[in-house]
């Protein structure tokens, strides 16, 4: 299982529902008023690529809002959208309130995001966060993995990190650049359809390394956000051990678009000492 944050079609996102719930009201979480003071990042993930600026953040976040609304509408039509007061949804909201104040250091735009957290009844082991802070969890990942609050916080922090680091924006921008560049080259060289095939392969190879780095970055940023929120850093390792048990290790990391479970655990364990004091400070506070 690879945790992704990308613009998904409403049909895929709301499929496989296993619960039916009554209609509910929208739930919004604002980051601005409760934002924590800027703090020095403890994990080292480097800077974001400038190429992402080819895709306007406002445009992408607007598209995300529309897609998110469609996902919720479809889930609601199937009775799969958790109502206000549902115990698992209350858990998610409580965790989100503790994490959101620590998001703005990773992206100043997050101060103005209208964070939303929803729960969809589905057997899928999945959770995601669209640009602009639109989060969805599926009951399958909580129930089947029997996640405690600390482990849920690690998933939520990971998904938030994808949005905060603008991975979807960067992915789309790089895709545009690659498509335009390879298309022009194919025409100039007269490669025709052969050029298109090569272009498709090249796009896959370019995205392979990018996506693996993306996931590692989200793991580490999410770990720090969760630790600052007062959730045990060790829960990140526990989570991925559960993932391995549920899904297998998926082969070596270089054969996947994301790091293998074993590689993720190793990277997380190496970074636990960097955030342990953040958890301790939050626990005392």
What are these regions (language model features)?
Residues 2-285:
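A Zn2+-metalloprotease active-site environment signal
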């Amino acid at each position: 299982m690879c945790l992704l944050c990308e613009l998904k079609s409403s049909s895929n996102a709301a499929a496989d529902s296993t619960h039916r719930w009554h209609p509910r009201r929208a739930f919004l979480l604002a980051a601005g008023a409760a934002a924590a003071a800027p703090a020095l990042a403890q994990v080292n993930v480097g800077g974001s690529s400038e190429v992402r600026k080819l895709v306007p953040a406002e445009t992408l976040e607007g598209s995300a809002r529309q897609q998110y609304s469609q996902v919720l509408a479809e889930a609601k039509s199937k009775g799969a959208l958790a109502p206000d007061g549902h115990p698992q949804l209350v858990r998610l909201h409580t965790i989100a309130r503790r994490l959101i104040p620590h998001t703005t250091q990773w992206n100043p735009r997050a101060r103005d995001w209208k964070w939303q957290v929803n729960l969809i009844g589905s057997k899928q082991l999945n959770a995601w966060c669209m640009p602009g802070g639109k989060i969805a969890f599926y009951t399958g990942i909580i129930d089947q993995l029997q996640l405690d609050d600390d482990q849920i916080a690690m998933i939520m922090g990971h998904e938030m990190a994808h949005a905060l680091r603008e991975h979807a924006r960067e992915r789309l921008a790089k895709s545009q650049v690659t498509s335009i560049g390879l298309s022009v080259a194919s025409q100039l060289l007269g490669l025709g359809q052969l050029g298109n095939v090569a272009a498709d392969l090249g796009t896959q190879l370019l995205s392979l390394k990018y996506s693996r780095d993306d996931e590692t970055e989200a793991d580490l940023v999410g770990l720090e956000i969760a630790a600052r929120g007062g959730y045990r850093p060790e829960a990140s390792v526990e989570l991925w051990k559960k993932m391995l048990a549920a899904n297998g290790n998926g082969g070596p990391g270089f054969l996947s678009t994301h790091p293998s479970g074993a590689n993720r655990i190793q990277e997380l364990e190496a970074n636990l000492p960097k955030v342990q004091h953040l958890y301790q400070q939050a626990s005392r506070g």
